[in-house]
Every structure is written in structure tokens, then in C-alpha cells.
């Protein structure tokens, strides 16, 4: 037990914030707003969607990497990861191993396809590969996902701080929501990227301060580790192959790959950031630079959890009724160990809300891109002017920002209904990853297969998720002690809990219990676990005990299996007719050292070499010829050629021929004689999507 006589478990009272703490919180908001104003003024003459949604498409990889990190390392992560260590074991650290494969897969399998197409919305790919309907279904699913996620990210830290410190709940919700909406709407993607960079710095500063001061309060990090070791919290590995094991090495590494690649590989927010880089190489560099940051936030959170357990090892604040849920432990810990250090709790508040700001701003900008590209332009105003499109994007971002704020208010009233709604959110990312995987990896998949795979996977995952919430299988926790709680102050301590009203307490439990289902693999509520209902084990019970970390992998497998079966039953796409720009050469990427005679059959007939002449000079791909323009040229050129003769000579000055001349690895069907280029076009057209 930490030395001192003014800690919450001894006095029954929780320390409160000072004026300086509120000033530091306000400072974070002001700096974020100023960055938005700066870029609004600086780029006032660049009123186009490329600048607003893609930051002009020439961003440096450093701010992009920081924004990639900040977008989904949210306040829920700051609250949830330490709570995981406090309640369970250190096995969770294995999720960091999966990050290596996540970044590799995202940077070298998925992102090159999106970058090659120069998309603004990731779901444009689904229309090109399948159909407009699949694109719309994917885009709307993503928007619902992000709206729910943004609301929880905004509400969770506000509620946790309010419950522990009395920090004004709706004051923080409204101020953070409005400032975030303001600078995102005003400054666009550049403002989002640079505010994310500032906010990730605040997150690291806050986490480091909490760890240093927390370790000091228990006699150092080694002493904290020893205390945790006494109760088995320092177990480093669980090699159980049982998929019901909540956190095994297999689940955290293999399941974690699918959970996180759904974020870094195909999520609109991350794809948009990657496409804002000046080149594919810069986008890949940004991805890899982001990796140490992922590890830093993860392991800082893990170590804070160990010190937090060491501090409360003889008096669990939840059972002592100081707080009502695990997501309130970190703010309580901050107030206990740093409440007397003037202004430092405010640094933690800045850290917490920086995570919220970065996530919400990224979400608003990505939703604006999807609504503009996938709904408004796709169905209503295809030929909208750039100025008007930019203004519409700003309006959409602002409108959804207000919706996000409003949804947090509704969240405080819905209670159990909200729990069911938010549980659905966690099962969406896997099916979306599945439909992109189906399109990029399996050339035989067709539109019917994409529809069936996406819908079937969503239904199956909803079934598992809802069943899990009903059954609530018990999950054992590491031991917690109450031997040194000051029970004479039980009444006083209980009165502290009254800082949270009834509805807030209910939603706090909802937030915690829903955290497991989110993409950043955050954590389950202690309250939900302890209240697990006793039910009769039916034949499907094992399905409902599936570890949440396997959800994305299960969803991807379901999507691909259903999608391929339906595709073959309804007339598969011929691999030889597949446009290679829409595919990812998986085996070439994973096994580049294999000889050509082995790799050739593993390409399943897709002619990836056909695209090389468009990629040999990246300047052409990025700036001079958009892929849709290439397709349009094919359609026009082939119509004219086929009406006359396949031996008609192609114009040596045409843009396609100029691109062909840049290919240093000439394919057999392309010769240096322009007279034979028509046949090249005939053959090349067969590799487009029919």
C-alpha cells in the first residue's frame, strides 16, 4: 500500500481539480482551434476537395504517421489498457506483436491498391471491383460505425472524469465536441493532421507523467512488478489453443492481426491519411514510423496498470465503492498520486481529451469524404464543382459533429438499449475487412458473392455478439484485496459515488462492457463480468464464449467463405479478365524470393505484369493520369478500333502509348512498334473488370 494519509481509500474523499487543471484543459482546446484557423487562412485560396479531404495529396510522412497513431489510440485506450492490467494479467502485451504484421499487411497489401486508384473514399474501390450497391452498403456501414464510435470516445472520458473528480460532464462533452467540429470543418485534413500531431504529443506527456509519478508512489517500477507478481498478474504468456480463452498468445497475435488490420488496412480514416502522402513510398514510410508509437502507448498503458494495482493492492476502489466501473480507475489513480501536484492532473486531462479530439476529428473528416463521394456525387450531383463539393464536405463534417454531440446526450438516457446498439459496432469492422479481402485477394469473387459475404458475416457476428451479451459467460479475474480499506468511511465513500447520477452510472457500465467490441481491442467492464448471469449451457454456449479478439478473424473468414461459394454458384469472375489494378499480388508480396515458376500459378491467372507500365514512373500514376481516365480511354479507343480493324495503328503520341514507352519491363504483347499497339490494347482490355 502506498504511503500517505490523504488517499481516497483512507479518507473516502476524492481530490478535486484546481483552476490550473482547467486552464491546461482549455489550452489543449485553444491550440487545436488555432491550428484549424491557421490552415483555413493559409489555404483560403485552395477551395477544393483534394486539399480539404486529402491535404493536397503531398503531405510529409511524419505528420501523417502521427495522425495515423492518434486516430485510433483514443481516450478509451488510455482508460482501458491500464484497467486490463489491473483486473487480469500482463498477457495482453502480446497484442503488440501483432502490430508488426498489421503494419506490414496494411502498408504492402491493402494501401498500394487504394493508392494506385487514387481514391478519396476507400469504398470507391468496391464499386470498381463489384458494384455501386456494394460500395454504398460498405460506406453507410462505415458511417454508422464511426458515428457510434465517436460518441463513445467523446462520452467515455467525460463520464469517467465526472464520476471521479466532479469535472463537469456536459461542459467537457460540448466544449470538446464543438472545438473538434470547428477546426475539422474550418481547416480540413491539414488541420486534422497537425492537430493530431500536437495531441499525440500531449497523450505521451500525460501517460509518461502518470507512470513516473505512479511508480514513485509505490517504491519504483521493480517494486510495483513484484507486488503484481504476488497475485499472478505478471504472467507473460498463455498458450492455450482454446478460442474461448479470453487472451491467449494465439488470440492476441493472430486474432489481433485481423482486429487491427481492419483499422490500418481498410478503414476510411487511415486510407485517407495514407492517400494524403505525396507517394506510395511516403505512405508506407508513414505506416512504419507509426509502429513505435503504437508500442509506446500500449506498453505505457500496461505499465500504468501494474503500478495502479500496486497502489490499490490492499483496497480495490470498485468493491470499496469509490468508483463504479473499471474505466474510472485511471482518473482516480491520477487524483490520488498527483492530486497534490499543482497542474499535473490537468496534464492528464489534456492527455485524455487529446485522444478524444484526434479520434473525433479523424472520424468527421472521413465521414465527410464518404458522404460526398459515395452518396452525394454517386447518386445526386456527379459533376459538382470543386468549390461546391468542398463547401458540402465542410457542411457534412459540421453536421455530423453536432450529431456526435447530440448522440452523447442520448447515450446518457438510453441505458440498456445503448448497450445493445453499441455491441453491434464491434462486429462491423470484420465484415468490412472481409469484403475488401474478398475483392483484393480472390479474383473469382463477383458482386453476388460480395453482397452475400458482407450481409452473411454481419448477421453471423451480430448473432454471436448478442448471444454473448445475453449469456454473459463468466471470466475469471486476478485476485483483489480489501484488507486495508477504511470501512469506517463506507458511508462517506458511498457519498462520493453520488457524483455520478443513475443514468451516468448505467452508461458507464455500458461503455466498459462495450469496449471489448471496438477496433482498438479495448477492455471489458468489471461490473459486467462480476454480474454474469447463471444460465443453462445449451449447444451454442461454446460459440458465445468465443474470445472477442477472434471476432474480426471470424468475420473475415465468414465473408470470404460465403462470398466465394456464392460467386462460384452464380458465375465466378474469370481471373484472366480481372483488372490487375484492383488486386493485391499476395504471394508475390509475402514470398518475393520464390522462383517465377512457383509464383506464376499462385497468381491464379491474374496478369499483374500488365499494370507495370502505369507504375514504372510514379509521377504519371499520381499526377498525370487518373485510373478512371485510363478506363475511359480504353472504352473509347477500343470502340473505335474494333469498328475498323485490330491492325489499325495507334497514335504514337497518345497518352496510353506514352505510358507504355515508360515500361522498362516490356511484356510480350507490347512491342516498340506503335503499329502493333492496337492489339496490345485489345489484349489489355480483357484484363479490365467486365
PLM regions: where:
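Membrane-embedded helix-loop-helix hairpins and adjacent transmembrane boundary segments
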Residues: 1-690
Amino acid at each position: 500500500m502506498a504511503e500517505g494519509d490523504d488517499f481516497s481509500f483512507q479518507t473516502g474523499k476524492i481530490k478535486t481539480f484546481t483552476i490550473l487543471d482547467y486552464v491546461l484543459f482549455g489550452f489543449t482546446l485553444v491550440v487545436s482551434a488555432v491550428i484549424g484557423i491557421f490552415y483555413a487562412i493559409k489555404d483560403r485560396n485552395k477551395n477544393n476537395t483534394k486539399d480539404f479531404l486529402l491535404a493536397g495529396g503531398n503531405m510529409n510522412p511524419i505528420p501523417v504517421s502521427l495522425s495515423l497513431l492518434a486516430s485510433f489510440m483514443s481516450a478509451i485506450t488510455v482508460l482501458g489498457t491500464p484497467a486490463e492490467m489491473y483486473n487480469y494479467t500482463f498477457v495482453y502485451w502480446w497484442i503488440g506483436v501483432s502490430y508488426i504484421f498489421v503494419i506490414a499487411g496494411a502498408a504492402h497489401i491493402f494501401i498500394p491498391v487504394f493508392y494506385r486508384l487514387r481514391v478519396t473514399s476507400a469504398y470507391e474501390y468496391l464499386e470498381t471491383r463489384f458494384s455501386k450497391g456494394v460500395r454504398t452498403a460498405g460506406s453507410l456501414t462505415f458511417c454508422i460505425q464511426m458515428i457510434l464510435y465517436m460518441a463513445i470516445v467523446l462520452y467515455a472520458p467525460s463520464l469517467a472524469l465526472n464520476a471521479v473528480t466532479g469535472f463537469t460532464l456536459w461542459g467537457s462533452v460540448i466544449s470538446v465536441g464543438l472545438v473538434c467540429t470547428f477546426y475539422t470543418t474550418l481547416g480540413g485534413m491539414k488541420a486534422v493532421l497537425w492537430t493530431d500531431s500536437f495531441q499525440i504529443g500531449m497523450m505521451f506527456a500525460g501517460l509518461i507523467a502518470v507512470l513516473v509519478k505512479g511508480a514513485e508512489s509505490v517504491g519504483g517500477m521493480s517494486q510495483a512488478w513484484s507486488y503484481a507478481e504476488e497475485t499472478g498478474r505478471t504472467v507473460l504468456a498463455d498458450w492455450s489453443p482454446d478460442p474461448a480463452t479470453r487472451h491467449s498468445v494465439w488470440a492476441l497475435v493472430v486474432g489481433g492481426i485481423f482486429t487491427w488490420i481492419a483499422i490500418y488496412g481498410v478503414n476510411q480514416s487511415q486510407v485517407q491519411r495514407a492517400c494524403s502522402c505525396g507517394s506510395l513510398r511516403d505512405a508506407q514510410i508513414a505506416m512504419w514510423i507509426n509502429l513505435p508509437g503504437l508500442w509506446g502507448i500500449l506498453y505505457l498503458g500496461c505499465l500504468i496498470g501494474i503500478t495502479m494495482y500496486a497502489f490499490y493492492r490492499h483496497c480495490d476502489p470498485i468493491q470499496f465503492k469509490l468508483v463504479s466501473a473499471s474505466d474510472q480507475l485511471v482518473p482516480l489513480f491520477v487524483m490520488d498520486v498527483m492530486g497534490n501536484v499543482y497542474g499535473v492532473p490537468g496534464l492528464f486531462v489534456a492527455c485524455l481529451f487529446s485522444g478524444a479530439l484526434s479520434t473525433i476529428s479523424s472520424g468527421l473528416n472521413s465521414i465527410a469524404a464518404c458522404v460526398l463521394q459515395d452518396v452525394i456525387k454517386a447518386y445526386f450531383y456527379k459533376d459538382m464543382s470543386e468549390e461546391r463539393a468542398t463547401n458540402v464536405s465542410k457542411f457534412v463534417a459540421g453536421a455530423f459533429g453536432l450529431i456526435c454531440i447530440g448522440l452523447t446526450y442520448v447515450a446518457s438516457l438510453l441505458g440498456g438499449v445503448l448497450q445493445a446498439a453499441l455491441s453491434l459496432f464491434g462486429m462491423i469492422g470484420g465484415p468490412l475487412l472481409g469484403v475488401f479481402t474478398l475483392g483484393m485477394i480472390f479474383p473469382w469473387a463477383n458482386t453476388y458473392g460480395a453482397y452475400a459475404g458482407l450481409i452473411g458475416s454481419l448477421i453471423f457476428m451480430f448473432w454471436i455478439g448478442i448471444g454473448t451479451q445475453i449469456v454473459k459467460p463468466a471470466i475469471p479475474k486476478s485476485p483483489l484485496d480489501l484488507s486495508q480499506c477504511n470501512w469506517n468511511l463506507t458511508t462517506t465513500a458511498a457519498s462520493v459515488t453520488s457524483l455520478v447520477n443513475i443514468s451516468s452510472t448505467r452508461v458507464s457500465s455500458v461503455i466498459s462492457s462495450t469496449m471489448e467490441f471496438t477496433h482498438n481491442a479495448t477492455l471489458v467492464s468489471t461490473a459486467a463480468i462480476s454480474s454474469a448471469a447463471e444460465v443453462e449451457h445449451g449447444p451454442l454456449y461454446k460459440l458465445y464464449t468465443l474470445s472477442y479478439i477472434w471476432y474480426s478473424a471470424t468475420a473475415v473468414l465468414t465473408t470470404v467463405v460465403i462470398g466465394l461459394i456464392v460467386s462460384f454458384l452464380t458465375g465466378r469472375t474469370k481471373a484472366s479478365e480481372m483488372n490487375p489494378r484492383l488486386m493485391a499480388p499476395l504471394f508475390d508480396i509475402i514470398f518475393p524470393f520464390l522462383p517465377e515458376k512457383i509464383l506464376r500459378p499462385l497468381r491464379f491467372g491474374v496478369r499483374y505484369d500488365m499494370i507495370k507500365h502505369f507504375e514504372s514512373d510514379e509521377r504519371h500514376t499520381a499526377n498525370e493520369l487518373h485510373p478512371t481516365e485510363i478506363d475511359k480511354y480504353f472504352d473509347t479507343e477500343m470502340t473505335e478500333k474494333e469498328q475498323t480493324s485490330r491492325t489499325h495503328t495507334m497514335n504514337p503520341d497518345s497518352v496510353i502509348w506514352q505510358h507504355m514507352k515508360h515500361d522498362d519491363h516490356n511484356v510480350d504483347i507490347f512491342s516498340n512498334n506503335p503499329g502493333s499497339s492496337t492489339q496490345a490494347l485489345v489484349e489489355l482490355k480483357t484484363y479490365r473488370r467486365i
